[in-house]
Amino acid sequence: MLSAFLLLVGCSGDKQEKNMSITVNLRYTGVNGNAKKFAEEMVSRGTVDAIRAEKGNLRYEYFQSLDDPETILLIDSWADQEAIDAHHATPMMNTIAELREKYDLHMTVERYTAVETPETENKFIRK
């Protein structure tokens, strides 16, 4: 089933995804609005801005599901695996883990590697 998502937090600005970038989709699920509270606290603490400023970060955006108010989608894109590894080595990962525990969130993770859009698909893309 295809879920619809509503943008919850502004985009990371003028960063563009490049070939071979890695995008990680994390779905946070909780109860009583905890997933949204988690995302809001990530923003209010400045953690989101700090992640967006990290070398190699291309995108860090939260979206709220239109058909499941207890789910928040994080789209997190990086230039390469080295950038992800550097991010995972930062102290802010402890902050993120503590917030996940605070809000009792459960996660599913999907990981994608960017490739060029085939020419045959360009006719379906409205720019």
Residue ranges of model-derived segments:
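C-terminal motif of bacterial Sec signal peptides marking the signal peptidase cleavage site
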Residues: 8-10
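Short, well-ordered beta-strand segments in beta-rich or mixed alpha/beta enzyme
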Residues: 22-29, 59-92, 110
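Sec-dependent signal peptide recognition
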Residues: 1-2
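Glycine-rich beta-strand-turn "strand-cap" elements at beta-sheet edges
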Residues: 14-19, 61-70, 95-127
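Short amphipathic alpha-helical segments
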Residues: 34-58, 92-96
